[in-house]
Amino acid sequence: MTEVTELMRPEGEALNTKEVLLNLGPQHPSTHGVLRLVLQLDGEYVERIDPHIGYLHRGTEKLAESFTYTQIFPLTDRLDYLCPPSNNLAFALAVEKLLGIEAPIRAQYIRVMMAELARISGHLLITGALPMDLGAMTALLYAMREREMIMDLLEMITGARMHTSYCRVGGVREDLPDGFLPKIREFCEIFPNRIRDYERLIENNRVFLSRTQGIGVISAADAVDLGLSGPNLRASGVDWDIRRDEPYEIYDRLDFDVITREEGDCYARWLCRVDEMRESIRLIEQCMEQMPEGPFQVDIPTIAFPVDKERVHCSMEALIQHFDLSAYGFDVPAGEVYSVIEAPKGELGFYIISDGSPKPFRMKVRAPSFVNLQALFGVTNARYLADMIAVLGSLDPVMAEVDK
């Protein structure tokens, strides 16, 4: 047996070290999905990161070439499955741009309200999950309590809790149900105080602060060079938000602040998302105040399903309209378009090439999580194994959106 004294080295003499390869994932709670990182370690120091993605690849972009434009909406639900209304909206806007149409004003307000609910839902999860990754579990339990309220609201309006498929080309699937606005007003009254509860849980937690402040710093220049977007970009001091700078739908009618931080570290990214939830509440409240009466989808029989579903049972014209759109879809003029929105994770874009048929010739998704994930490999001051968990959580990738 080797004596303990034999393992000791004279002062100043270097120890012999051995590089170790460590698999982080693909089944690991802190990777937030099926991400595999092969880490080359020297002790606890990470010398190299080799990412392995694709475990959740379903061929979404190729599948879209075999689907009509209406049938593609369920595929978009499964990109960032935490925030499907935002995915639906981005795709609908791209197709509407090709068609040269706009959704009715009431439908635009409903879409924006749903997109902001989705933003809160997505931010809530990482608001609680990042502290949990670092050992503080209570915040996640609080966050899931409020997220359950949002799931109930989504179920009330769409009939589904996750894969909502609520948007349609030219509007939304159905109008707001009776009793929905009082429910969402109740949520808007409760939620700001709940956000303050999250901050009280975390802002004096010395362990969480030491694990996130000054860790994973991304400068403004690096954030731009890496192509980051969303809270990950704004936390580095870049004042850019598509909702304000390239407004779509009715965002130019709404008043809100773009949240930025200067530190660019893990804590700044967490704070950005917390503050953005407050702004989303402001936007939802303005939507409820300004929303006019009127149609919830365009009145174009060749594009939109019959508004009155009862007519399908007693009108031959409505039945034919419903059957044709369900079975064959609608032709979209030949051309190409790129449409982008400010999704919860960042800039979500759809590039579509149409050949004039009811199905896209090519569809490309610009997924923000795919771009944001690359920042993990560009961070220079977070090279310890424990820091990888904090940085990855603060970037908030969704692997379904990365792998598509």
From Swiss-Prot:
Catalysis: reaction(s): a quinone + NADH + 5 H(+)(in) = a quinol + NAD(+) + 4 H(+)(out)
Enzyme class: translocase
Domain of life: Bacteria
UniProt entry keywords in alphabetical sequence: Cell inner membrane, Cell membrane, Membrane, NAD, Plasmid, Quinone, Translocase, Transport, Ubiquinone
InterPro entries: NADH_Q_OxRdtase_suD, NDH1_su_D/H, NiFe-Hase_large
One CC-aspect GO term: plasma membrane
Gene Ontology MF: a single term: NADH:ubiquinone reductase (non-electrogenic) activity
Main location: membrane
Localisation: Cell inner membrane
Protein topology in the membrane: Peripheral membrane protein
Assembly mode: NDH-1 is composed of 14 different subunits. Subunits NuoB, C, D, E, F, and G constitute the peripheral sector of the complex.
NCBIfam families: NuoD, PRK06075.1
Protein family (similarity comment): Belongs to the complex I 49 kDa subunit family.
Function: NDH-1 shuttles electrons from NADH, via FMN and iron-sulfur (Fe-S) centers, to quinones in the respiratory chain. The immediate electron acceptor for the enzyme in this species is believed to be ubiquinone. Couples the redox reaction to proton translocation (for every two electrons transferred, four hydrogen ions are translocated across the cytoplasmic membrane), and thus conserves the redox energy in a proton gradient.
Protein's UniProt name: NADH-quinone oxidoreductase subunit D 2
Annotated source species: Sinorhizobium medicae (strain WSM419) (Ensifer medicae)
Phylogenetic classification of the source organism: Bacteria, Pseudomonadati, Pseudomonadota, Alphaproteobacteria, Hyphomicrobiales
Gene that encodes it: nuoD2
